[in-house]
Structure formats: C-alpha cells, structure tokens
Amino acid sequence: MTNIRKTHPPIKIINHSFIDLPAPSNISAWWTFGSLLGLCLLIQILTGLFLAMHYTSDTMTAFSSVTHICRDVNYGWLIRYMHANGASMFFICLFLHVGRGLYYGSYTYLETWNIGVILLFAVMATAFMGYVLPWGQMSFWGATVITNLMSAIPYIGTTLVEWIWGGFSVDKATLTRFFAFHFILPFIVAALVMVHLLFLPETGSNNPSCLISDSDKIPFHPYYTIKDVLGVLLLLLLFMMLVLFSPDLLGDPDNYTPANPLNTPPHIKPEWYFLFAYAILRSIPNKLGGVLALVFSILILMLFPILHMSKQRSMMFRPLSQCLFWILVADLFTLTWIGGQPVEYPFITIGQVASILYFTIILLALPSISMLENKLLKW
C-alpha cells in the first residue's frame, strides 16, 4: 500500500518541505530560526485575529477599545501583550536569521535570499502600521513623521503623502486604511513565506561548513523536528517571561497617553527594531538623502551576492571577515542605541560615524578583505 503522504498532492508538498526533506547532517542551532519565525507569524496572526474582534479603527474610540480589551475582555490583556511583544520576538528571530544567512553565505541562493529581503520589508511595513493602531501619542506622531518622509520624493512627494493620509493630516481615514492593511499584510507575508520555502528544496539547505553535503543527507523528520521543538520551547519560555513579567519593557510610555495632535512628545521614535534604520535616517542632514539612506540600509542586503568576492562561501574559515562581521554587528547595536537618543551632541556625531561605518563595511571593507583572504590562500 502506498503511503498517503507520498501520493496525495497537497500532503506531498508538505512532505517534501517538512518531513522527507533531505537536510545536511551538520546544521547547527542557527538553522532553527526559520521554524521559529513560522511560529512567531502564527502567534501574530492568531492573537491579531482575536484583537481585531474587539478593536475599532476610529480616532475617537481606538484608544478606548484597546483599554477595553485589556480591562474587560477575558484574557484580553494577555492577547494584547502577546501580540505587542510577539512583534519584538519576531524581529529578534528575523535579525538572527538574516545574520546567520550573512555569516554562512546563504545569500548565494539568489531567489530564496531576495524573497527573504522582500519578506523583511513586508514585515517591517506590517509592524509599522500595527504600531499606529493603539492611537497613543507615539502611534500618532510616529505615523506623522514616517509617512511625511514620502514628501522628500521630488514632484509627487506632497501629493503622495496626502494620498496616503487620505486628507491633510494623519486622521480617521489614515487609521482606517492602516488597520485594513495591517490585517491583510500578514496573510501576504504567509504567502511569501510559502514562496520562500518553495525555492529552498531547489538548492537544498546550506550548512555551517558550506561544503556540498549531498553525500551526507538525513531526513528532516525526526532529526530536525525534535531539534526545532527545543528551539520552540526556549522561545516560548523567553516570550512568556517577557509577556507575563515585564510586558512594557520594549514599549514606549508615551503610547499610554491618547493621541493629541496639539502636543508633540519630546522624543519621537519608532519601536526598538526600527531604531538602527531611524538612526541612519537622522544622521543625514538632507531629507531626501536621509530617506534614500534609510531604504538602502535594508535594500543593501540584496547586494550581498554581488559583493561576495571570496572563494569560500562561509565566514567559518575566514578570520579577517569574521572580525569585520562582528564589528558590523556591534555597529548595528550602536545605531539602535543612537536611534533612541535625543538629537544633540554627542549622539549626532556618533550616529553619523556609525552610519558611515555601516555602509563602508558592507560596500568596501568586506569585499576588499575577501580579496585579500583569496591572496592569503596562495601564500
């Protein structure tokens, strides 16, 4: 009798992606973040669905509806904080997943990598619009500042901003459309995830040594399903500790004040996971230049396959590139810290130096060091 998982068309696709998928025998815990991202997306969609049942996208009642969810709905506080902190966990896993891809040269799988970068943009757009929905002070002013960046686009900028706002300022129309987009985007993200996974079996998984592992493959189930379960349990432990013990640790106190267009908060800043890009934006005095630097700070990931000059794929056996990689990581931490600081001396200078360093490492230093390492191989 033939096995249903190998013959039934839809089940066969799942089987080839998660059960009988041939996986290298030496992949480390860094490869767990893909499945953890899937879990984060599932948590976000489910908690978001329950929140949407009670939320109202109207400027007069949005803030009150979130308060109502926390106070009156059964376990509403838990659902709300799981959704808010779930976004943070999502981005932690995303950054680690991308970092692993950079370290081990996974960007040489062009289709998978480029769809991954598009996914990153889609998730960032979703998170930004979600931050606007509670209609607190930081929601309102964050939406105003970030959407206003579009006005830097020549000729069509102002018209484009007013078109996004649905009026002459961030108001009811803006909130309603942001809620609509915030609701639909996660499902688009889920569809993109399917495409992302679809390209993976075409090339097979990468591995830490970056050597061809065709001669030594093992089935994904049970070996890596068990390994992923450990990652899931650890993630849920950290996640629930954050949600139950310090749910407001990563939030902004200003968002507990209802939105007031007449009162600007002293420091307007986005959520922590956007701070590195926000710091790059602020470090350039010109508005259009800042916007271009902001977009390019993420879009630069698509250039990695072109900038790869090394004869080796991974950084595992390239100590000089490793040093640069960890300097880049430290630089991103610095940018994140600077993004949350007021615009004054010495933070402006630190931000500018860190921004220049970020682009210099990626565009100049890494390719140059890779070419030097190629020479050293012959030495």
Curated annotation (Swiss-Prot):
GO terms for biological process: mitochondrial electron transport, ubiquinol to cytochrome c. Heme b b566 binds at H97, H196. Its cofactor is heme b. Pfam families: Cytochrom_B_C, Cytochrome_B. SUPFAM superfamilies: a domain/subunit of cytochrome bc1 complex (Ubiquinol-cytochrome c reductase) (SSF81648), Transmembrane di-heme cytochromes (SSF81342). The keyword rRNA-binding does not apply. It is a multi-pass membrane protein. It is found in: Mitochondrion inner membrane. The chain crosses the membrane at residues 33-53, 77-98, 113-133, 178-198, 226-246, 288-308, 320-340, 347-367. Binds 2 heme b groups non-covalently. It comes from the Eukaryota. Component of the ubiquinol-cytochrome c reductase complex (complex III or cytochrome b-c1 complex) that is part of the mitochondrial respiratory chain. The b-c1 complex mediates electron transfer from ubiquinol to cytochrome c. Contributes to the generation of a proton gradient across the mitochondrial membrane that is then used for ATP synthesis. The cytochrome bc1 complex contains 11 subunits: 3 respiratory subunits (MT-CYB, CYC1 and UQCRFS1), 2 core proteins (UQCRC1 and UQCRC2) and 6 low-molecular weight proteins (UQCRH/QCR6, UQCRB/QCR7, UQCRQ/QCR8, UQCR10/QCR9, UQCR11/QCR10 and a cleavage product of UQCRFS1). This cytochrome bc1 complex then forms a dimer. Belongs to the cytochrome b family. Heme 1 (or BL or b562) is low-potential and absorbs at about 562 nm, and heme 2 (or BH or b566) is high-potential and absorbs at about 566 nm. This is Cytochrome b. It comes from Sciurus niger (Eastern fox squirrel).
